[in-house]
Amino acid sequence: MPNLLIQGGQPLNGTIRPHGNKNAALPTLCASLLTDELVVLDNIPHITDVEKLVSYFKDMGSKVYWDKGAKRIELSHRDFGKAGNAALPVGMRSSVLLFAPLLHRIGQVPLAVNAKGCALGVRELDPHIEIMHHFGAEMIQSASAIDLKIAKPMQGCRHWADYMSVTATENFVMAAVLAKGNSILLNAASEPHVQDVCRFLVQLGAKISGIGTSRIEIEGVDSLSSGAFQISSDFHEVVTFLALGAMTDGHVEVHDVQTEHFDLIIRSFAKLGVSVENDGETLSVFPGQTRVIQKPLTSNILPKIEAAPWPYFPVDLLPLMIALSVRAQGEVQFWNKVYENGFSWIPELTKFGAHVVTSDPHRIVVFGNRPLRPATVEAPYIIRAAVALYMVAATIEGESRVIHADPIRRAHPGFVENLQRLGAVVHWD
């Protein structure tokens, strides 16, 4: 696997335009299967999971034109299924987002039971299968596979989810837009990428209300039309570059930001002593940040950042703020309320000299501003943890290495090139 070789200690300065959000691009590509008409998607990131979906579409007979330089994909699925019966893409959790589209198009979904995307912990299939069952699908299970089949058009339903699952919400929406009658989902996820998928489907003629809330109501339609849609910018990249600017005492401006999603994120930066300036569609950090962790008015508790489903602080951003806190003065608790394996990479972070105490599988305390040293660390199969390890290394004078850093490419095209434009000394080894 590729490694990152880092010469740290340089301040990062410059402007950045983030790529499209991976977590919006993948379900939107899957949702394009719900129409036979031409679909044009802009701001599509060039990442491995998109490559896998495009290959799958082509293997199944779809016509796909991908202009990688322009970040545009044009899709026509009119002949989908006529070229054979290709296996679902492997090694990507997003394969579950093909459940509803495939049941609508060909009436069945063959699925290996070990679909996964990263090492964050148990990522169960049950919520997705339960939703498809509510819409009329039947499950046939063997030791190594699960087949979902449906013999008649989907019927609208009401479902109260156990928890706010992003992909389960997206699967429900994709099933409901072409189901007969009305459907209601309670305890729906509302992340910006979920909103993107819903707005894309509305662009094609779907009738969805409650977008961005925990209650989504959908009136099924007979068919969807053609349409064009632009994927929103990746707020994970936005936070990464802002934090790197603050950590290295640099000046970084990030453009094309949907700043309406950043109120809580900006306040979380402030908890770590970093001021983020908001200028419409641009967020900036400047040199001279205090990086002193704010103490709460209640003096006997630690300052903390809690991560949970939106509109809480996004759990995928937690590693990036942990990296920033290592370079801040004071103590802060991080609480991951979603993944039981979300802090498995912390022992690698401590190889740099970071002082982190693991309280339990969901909580850690970072004691910031300790002396750090260059190190060779191993990234887990967790995208943002690999990024966070790079971020800390970038602040330390001398040569560090992040081995097995390839998961970064699953979400961040041109990651190294963007860093180099900001003045970082880093390359793939």
Predicted regions and their residues:
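Short, structured segments at the rim of ligand-binding sites
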Residues: M1-D429
